[in-house]
C-alpha cells in the first residue's frame, strides 16, 4: 500500500490516484495542481480541455519568473499565465484514473470534488550536452510525483433557527430595572 501525504476524512467516500517519476516539469505541474485543487471533477476536466485548446490559461503564481502575460489570466486575478500542455495531459490521465476508482467504489460522480492535490519533485534525471572547447554541461530534467484525492461533497447541515440574543451588561441592567419598576407600579 502506498502512503499518501493527506488522510481523507472518510475513506469510503473518496478515491485516490498517484503517479511517480512523471516526465513533466515540477514547476508547471505545481501551478496546474494549485489551480485545479478544490474544483468539481467535471469542471476540472473542462478546464484541462480548455487549456489544451488554449481557450483558458493556467495562472502562474509562484514560479512566474520570465512568464509572459496574457489576458486569459484575468479570470484568476493574475497577469502571468501559460498553457503547460504536457503537465495538463498527466493531470488529465490521473483524474481519469481517480474517476474510475471512484466509480468502482460506487461514489456519486456528479458530487466528486478534488480535495487534495500534491506535487513533489522527483530526483533529477541527468544527461549532458557538449559545449565549445571540449566542455560538457549538465542537462537535467525535473520530473514530478503527483497524488490526487477526490471525495464526494458533504451535504451542508442546515443551521438551527434558535438564535440566542446576546445582551451587554448595560442592556441587562436596564431590562432588570424596567422589570423592577413594572413590578413596583403594578403592586
UniProtKB/Swiss-Prot annotation:
Subunit architecture: Component of the large ribosomal subunit (LSU). Mature yeast ribosomes consist of a small (40S) and a large (60S) subunit. The 40S small subunit contains 1 molecule of ribosomal RNA (18S rRNA) and at least 33 different proteins. The large 60S subunit contains 3 rRNA molecules (25S, 5.8S and 5S rRNA) and at least 46 different proteins. uL22 is associated with the polypeptide exit tunnel.
The organism of origin for this protein: Schizosaccharomyces pombe (strain 972 / ATCC 24843) (Fission yeast)
One MF term in the entry's GO annotations: structural constituent of ribosome
Purpose: Component of the ribosome, a large ribonucleoprotein complex responsible for the synthesis of proteins in the cell. The small ribosomal subunit (SSU) binds messenger RNAs (mRNAs) and translates the encoded message by selecting cognate aminoacyl-transfer RNA (tRNA) molecules. The large subunit (LSU) contains the ribosomal catalytic site termed the peptidyl transferase center (PTC), which catalyzes the formation of peptide bonds, thereby polymerizing the amino acids delivered by tRNAs into a polypeptide chain.
This protein's record includes keyword Chaperone: no
Cellular localization per UniProt: Cytoplasm
InterPro entries (UniProt xref): Ribosomal_uL22, Ribosomal_uL22_CS, Ribosomal_uL22_euk/arc, Ribosomal_uL22_sf
Gene Ontology biological process terms in this record: cytoplasmic translation
Note: There are 2 genes for uL22 in S.pombe.
Record keywords, A-Z: Cytoplasm, Ribonucleoprotein, Ribosomal protein
A GO-annotated cellular component: preribosome
Family statement: Belongs to the universal ribosomal protein uL22 family.
Superkingdom of the source species: Eukaryota
Name of the featured protein: Large ribosomal subunit protein uL22B
